[in-house]
Each structure stands twice: as C-alpha cells, then as structure tokens.
Amino acid sequence: MTELKADVRNGIDYKVADLSLADFGRKEIRLAEHEMPGLMALRREYHDVQPLKGARISGSLHMTVQTAVLIETLVSLGAEVRWASCNIFSTQDHAAAAVVVGPNGTPEEPKGVSVFAWKGETLEEYWWAAEQMLTWDGEPANMILDDGGDATMMVLRGAQYEKAGVVPPAEDDDPAEWKVFLGVLRERFEQDKTKWTKIAESVKGVTEETTTGVLRLYQFAAAGELAFPAINVNDSVTKSKFDNKYGTRHSLIDGINRGTDVLIGGKKVLICGYGDVGKGCAESLAGQGARVSVTEIDPINALQALMDGFDVRTVEEAIGEADIVITATGNKDIITLDHMKAMKNQAILGNIGHFDNEIDMAALERSGAKKINIKPQVDQWIFDDGKSIIVLSEGRLLNLGNATGHPSFVMSNSFSNQVIAQIELWTKNDEYDNEVYRLAKHLDEKVARIHVEALGGTLTKLSKDQAEYIGVDVEGPYKPEHYRY
C-alpha cells in the first residue's frame, strides 16, 4: 500500500476525495439544517454559553450531510473537532469536503474541521484515518464521539498493549480487519510506546451512537477495562425508537432500490432480527407489498413479529425461498456460506447491522466463487454450480453504502442526544465514574419536545392535580426509567 499522507492547507490537515465538491456539500448542509430542528435549537440555546469550550472531540461516525450539521453544532458550542467515518463506504464525499472548507472558507483557503474520510476506503486506509482522527497536535484528544466503538477500541486496546509491552500477533483465522487493526497498532508501538496510554488518560468520556458500540462498552466495563465514563446514546428513547426504526424504514428500501432497481412488491423477504432495526425493515418492505418472514432468538420479539403479521421461521427454513435477505441482528455469522449456497439464483443479500460479520463475507471470499462487480457496492457472486447471488455493500451497511442513510429529521433526534451527552460528560465529569450511563429521562423528553413542535404537534399540559394524581411533575419527566415505549 502506498504510504498515506494527510493534505495540509491553511493550517488544516485533512484527507478527503475532492475539496472542489464543497459547494455542493454546503448547499445540502443548508437544506439539512432546516430538517434538523433539534441541533439548530441547541445551537441557539448554548451558543453564548460555549459549554464545550476546551473540548477536543475525536469523532468516528458516518461522514454524511447530517453528520456535517452535528460537527458544526459541536464547533458552534466551543469544541475543537477531528473526524473520520466509522464505515469504509458511508462517507458522502461532498459533505466531507464541505466540513473541511467550512461555512466561511474556500477550497483554496479552508476554515473548517480536519476530516479524514472518503467513500470506498480500504481497511488499511480506514484504520489510518481513524488514527489521524485520534491524533492531535500538542495536547491529546479529551472526548470521543463514537459509532460502533472503533475509536474507543483503538484507544483502549492500544493502551492495553502498551501496558503489556507488546502488540499480540494476529492468528491465521482472525478476520482481515482485525489483522489490519493490529498491524496499525504494532507499527505505532514501534514508534511511540505511550501514545494510546496518554490519550486514554486524557479522555474525559465517550458518547456511543449505536447498538454494536454499546455492547462493546459494556464488555469493556465488565472486564474492568473502561478507562473513562461512557454515555449510551443508543438507548435514549429518542434515538433507538426513532433512528433505529423510522430511519431504517426510510433508508433500507432506498438502498435496495438504488442498488438493484428490483420491484419489491410480491417478493419473499427474510429479515434476520426483529429488534428496533428489524421492525423498521419489516414494516418498510411489507409496505412495498413484499411477503416478509422474520428470524428471531428472543420469544418476546418473535411474538411481536407474529402479532404484527409476519411469519417467524429459522434461516434454514426460509433461505431457499427468499428473494431478498436482510440481516439486522448485531450478531455474527447469521448468514453462513452454506446459507448463501442455498439461496435462490440471483437472490439479493444485504446487511443493515453495523459490522460486516453478520454475513460471513470472509468465507464467501475464500469459497472460490467468482465475483463480478456490477457497479459500486453491488457484486454478483457466481458459485461453481452456476447459481449466483447479489451482495450489497460487501456485507456492510447497505443503507449507507448503496444510499445516503437515514433522513435528516430522524438524525436530528439522535444527534441532539449526542450533543447533550457530550455537554453532560464535559461539564459534569466529576459526577461520572468509569461506567456506562444513559441520558436522563428529562433530556430525552427535551429532545422529543423540540421535534414535536417542529412537526406542528401540540402537547397537552397536565394540571397540578393531574400531575399529583399520577405522581409526576407538571413539566415531566412523565415516565419512570423502566417504562417501555
């Protein structure tokens, strides 16, 4: 691989596809700002206070137009920011360029934020970009904003290996990405044996966006390896019940349509997983007229699927009949090579969980099947018997690889939670131990209230007597922490 080097212009280091795309990106950012009332309200509320002044935020999250609005909100509240994408295919190159240039800069004289992201990165490029995002001139990063946990893992594993005095060798059967990750840490260790330890000691907290990253945080905490407090943004109601369900409901069919242009109506579809994301998948495809079946390990979710009108089957029972198969579990090895070989000729296979190991892409690549690239992020894999399947985005997030991800309004909910969580950990750090927390209910309700008003809804107001009768304050919060929405 050619050695990667950041570009530097007007004192800003960056690596994006093409800075000349910035004008297009800025136009889309302005449109997105109108559709992101939560972030814009937070800018108005906190701009004069500058609650993030002094924060050096390293962000690892899909570099989209919507994320650009998040980044510029953090900056407007006083933070310094460096950014990389958390997925090799999810970057929107015009958005990345616009963030580097900034609202008041030009491609010749950028005045924005350091971004290291472009669509179609290799694994080596991805982890190089992640390291650049975490590497600051002078003082190290002191906050992390994460999606999937890669930035957090890089800091914590790097510090762990520095303490041990060695980066372990990769095993032959390790995933390709893990081998690359260890290689990057090993190369850095040879040059600087304290880099990650210094960052881990400097970081005051991390806010995590998605289910997969939250699972990693809880695993680090259980092992006593979490070196700083964490806020689980994913399980805020205004994130998980909106982004995960309604966002997916919009973006899944967008990705399938852009990737394949097949008619969804009448097709047999198998959705693996019926959590919030799976529910959004099933609802959107059923709304297009597809005949949907669901796989589940959890009897409660399975019962929900049945009551919603979907068959519940195993992968083995349904795989041979499905025209479209979508994984949405957050687990690994959901679709194996044997499953892929059992699929119908030219069936479509895609994933909308965070990582690419829900579908065993490594086994497919080793199988001897012939890969034919149809167009970016659409590949036909032909098996020895002549049968083929269509795989979207190489088993990674198809809604971001084949389309542009969730729409701005629903991301305004999620990203408002991220901003509030960053402010919470930065300004009240002494109140948090090295554990995983959730945002307080009244903050969740605050985010919801902003978006209700933006959609023209009018909330009913409790009287004092009514509030006392059900044991809540007139201004909320209105539900206990254990309430399930």
Swiss-Prot record:
Subunit structure: Homotetramer.
Protein name listed in UniProt: Adenosylhomocysteinase
GO cellular component, one term: cytosol
Catalytic activity: S-adenosyl-L-homocysteine + H2O = L-homocysteine + adenosine
Gene for this chain: ahcY
Keywords: Cytoplasm, Hydrolase, Isopeptide bond, NAD, One-carbon metabolism, Ubl conjugation
Source species: Mycolicibacterium smegmatis (strain ATCC 700084 / mc(2)155)
GO biological process, one term: S-adenosylmethionine cycle
Function: May play a key role in the regulation of the intracellular concentration of adenosylhomocysteine.
